[in-house]
Amino acid sequence: MCIRDSAICAMYMGEMEVTTTHNPEGTGENFSAGSLMGQISFSRMLTDRFSFGISSKIIRENIYNSKATGFAIDLGTLYITQIQGLTMGMSISNYGTKMKMEGRDLLLQTEVDPSLESDPININANFATDPFELPLIFRFGLSYTKLISKDLKCLFAIDALHPNDNTESINAGTEISFKDFLFIRSGYANLYQRDRVSGLSAGCGIKLKISSSTYFIDYTYVDMGPLGNPKKLTLSTSF
């Protein structure tokens, strides 16, 4: 059996006031920042217990008038154990190109040679930013599903993360589903991570089946400590 999915995820941080070294109290202008990701996924059952999946995605980040774009893939496997309800999996996420910020905010004017005695000649220049790696992550996780009643079931999950840009950490969470339509979720991220910021998260979602397609709408609240409490709205579909 083959499964194909597509998804679009967006994060918007709202407007913030522009400050500079000359105007630390603000210039009167505002700026915003955000991220956008489009993804197409393919998975296949290799046996009745073992499956494999791959996702390709385009990632875009922007702040004020500058942006960066990159391409990455995710690879993962899933194994249904002989213990009823217990599943294990592993994955590699964000294996792809480097990203680099570009845009008119990085344009400036500079003198050709300040040591020359002639009148200064300013030319347009571009501030060259360094390319940066996507956060490559290796995950290993376990999940256990408990059927409470015909319409109600509970999922417990835990996974360990090994990233290329931070210390190792653990995520844990639970999901309660009603009639495979309404979902309530809660979890805790980045346990044991050094200098962690995010922590408790909670949210809900619904699953809609229309014709031969399935649509998912999910809302999430995340505690980001000193960065505030962002909210995420995710829309995805499978066909």
Positions of predicted regions on the chain:
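Sequence context surrounding c-type heme c attachment/ligation sites in exported
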Residues: 1
